[in-house]
Amino acid sequence: MIQKNWQELIKPNKVEFSSSSRTRATLVAEPLERGFGLTLGNALRRVLLSSLRGAAVTAVQIDGVLHEFSSIPGVREDVTDIVLNIKEIAIKMDGDDAKRMVVRKQGPGVVTAGDIQTVGDIEILNPEHVICTLDEGAEIRMEFTVNNGKGYVPAERNRAEDAPIGLIPVDSLYSPVKKVSYKVENTREGQVLDYDKLNMTIETDGSITGEDAVAFAARILQDQLGVFVNFDEPQKETEEEAVTELAFNPALLKKVDELELSVRSANCLKNDNIVYIGDLIQKTEAEMLRTPNFGRKSLNEIKEVLASMGLHLGMEVPAWPPENIEDLAKRYEDQY
């Protein structure tokens, strides 16, 4: 069946987010197939940094200023430095239409992003950010154009042909995600020791949480990769077909290598061709002790594990083993 190509790959049973602040979050996802930590980590990182939409200033008009190479009496920074500071204003804005916001202040003092008068659904996320410094008697008025977009747009592309004199275009840094780093470690699942564990740290401007950013990036990848799927999804079995009455506890379909036994005990079971718990519980204590290298310590370990599942050695299991045991194990894996 073609669906086994993707259905039989292990998927993370642990996806955890933790946030140390409004702008920083950490993701841990495990276990992943070997190599998938790097594959998914790199893909998510690229999309997070390049493809999520956010808001940014696209242009500014400063009273009395005709171009960005000017200086303003009583203002310590020149216009070029002011424009650079404006680029760093973090903004959250809903909607796709361009909006305007204004700041007007007299000196002496510092003009910060928190001094900006916003309208509608615009929110300044770093109000402490310094835009410029005014001396005694100085005054400044600036009007900003704000828009939504994605990625990085240079000032030249924000320069409208019919723009009035004095409207200075600004480089727009739309991405709400500022930094992404990840590392891949080994992790264990059952007796398999070389699965991948993905650790990712996401830093945003505060307009979006790290968890939502990852969710949006994953959805973008899902949507983009979907165009390469050139077949219809195989039909799922009907409920009537899917439900098979078992004559035994579904837990017996679990493989013994998932019991996290000691290496010695696990190797003894493997050498005795005991694959499933259903194989194991039909053995008596005497039969187990006749297994090469299997001692009383291993026996007690296995009895303790089985007891925690409500099972014991020497049980009788009707209709065991079933013919389609692998398919049944897949079907009932969420029940043990």
Curated annotation (Swiss-Prot):
InterPro entries: DNA-dir_RNA_pol_insert, DNA-dir_RNA_pol_RpoA/D/Rpb3, DNA-dir_RpoA, RBP11-like, RNAP_asu_C, RNApol_insert_sf. Residues 1-232 are annotated as: Alpha N-terminal domain (alpha-NTD). GO terms for cellular component: cytoplasm; DNA-directed RNA polymerase complex. It comes from the Bacteria. One of its GO terms (molecular function) is DNA binding. One of its GO terms (biological process) is DNA-templated transcription. It is an enzyme of class 2 (transferase). Homodimer. The RNAP catalytic core consists of 2 alpha, 1 beta, 1 beta' and 1 omega subunit. When a sigma factor is associated with the core the holoenzyme is formed, which can initiate transcription. DNA-dependent RNA polymerase catalyzes the transcription of DNA into RNA using the four ribonucleoside triphosphates as substrates. HAMAP family: RNApol_bact_RpoA (MF_00059). This is DNA-directed RNA polymerase subunit alpha. The gene is rpoA.
